[in-house]
Amino acid sequence: MLHTLMKSPFETNISFFSGMLKKTDDFLALQDGVLIALIDNIFLKKITFSSENLYVIKEDVYARGIHKNISSSFILISYIDFVNLTLKNKKQIIW
């Protein structure tokens, strides 16, 4: 399953959301959701514990000027890669 976070993690119930993630699920952060990938943020431990497949849209990361502060647990991908994730995952949840 693909879990997509588009809003800031401060506007989302991360405890509930991370409880829904399985280790094999794909997690993608885009738009303001990329803030969840910042090093040392309060949500990082919950999300890295919940899923092994963590992605952020690199265009959104660079647009916010945070590319040097992204956790190494996350893989930067393009919007084309995002399309491939949607093809891979028949089920999706947007948070």
Swiss-Prot record:
A single cellular component GO annotation: sulfurtransferase complex
Keyword vocabulary terms for this entry: Cytoplasm, tRNA processing
GO terms of biological process kind: tRNA wobble position uridine thiolation
Subcellular location: Cytoplasm
Function: Part of a sulfur-relay system required for 2-thiolation of 5-methylaminomethyl-2-thiouridine (mnm(5)s(2)U) at tRNA wobble positions.
Family recorded in the similarity comment: Belongs to the DsrH/TusB family.
UniProt name for this protein: Protein TusB
Phylogenetic lineage: Bacteria, Pseudomonadati, Pseudomonadota, Gammaproteobacteria, Enterobacterales
